[in-house]
Amino acid sequence: FYNVDTIIRIGSCGAYNEDLSLLDTILVDNAYTEGNYAYELNEEDCHIMNSSSDINKVIEDTAKELNIAYVKGNTLCTDCFDYYVKDVNSLIARFPKDLNIIGAEMEAFALFYNAKLLGKKASCLLSVVDSHYKHQEISADERQTSLNSMIKLALESAVNL
């Protein structure tokens, strides 16, 4: 539609790993969902999608060049903010244990799935803005002004593609 072949999504996420701190950058390896996006779109029972490994390699190399720290891992793609979930611990207990989910966001699964269907490439960088384990969050103002490392990494990586 827009003749785009590669997308690096940037956004915010909640931390599901006690080792993550506010404003840490996550490079998403796989996005897991309990939702039915793939089935509704394409009648496929699919709940995990991987990002494009070649884009991730460029991002990793760029992070090293720029001395930007990141954590690579798997995320949960939710249909609602976990802040509003009745029992977030019950939600976390449902995750496949072998996935080692480290964060939660709301778009990566669909992005990766659409990229697969269309023969495109997609990756995702996230900044941690709240922590389930540490009961911390950054302010709305900080969400607008403090995500510079992630944004710089995405832009410089795009130049290096």
Where does each model-flagged region fall?
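Zn-dependent metallopeptidase/amidohydrolase metal-coordination segment
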Residues: F109-E142
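Metabolite-binding pocket within alpha/beta catalytic cores that recognizes anionic/polar moieties
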Residues: F1-V58
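Glycine-rich beta-alpha junction loops
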Residues: G14, L76-D82, A110, V129-S131
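A C-terminal functional module that forms or caps the active site or interfaces directly
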Residues: V88-K121
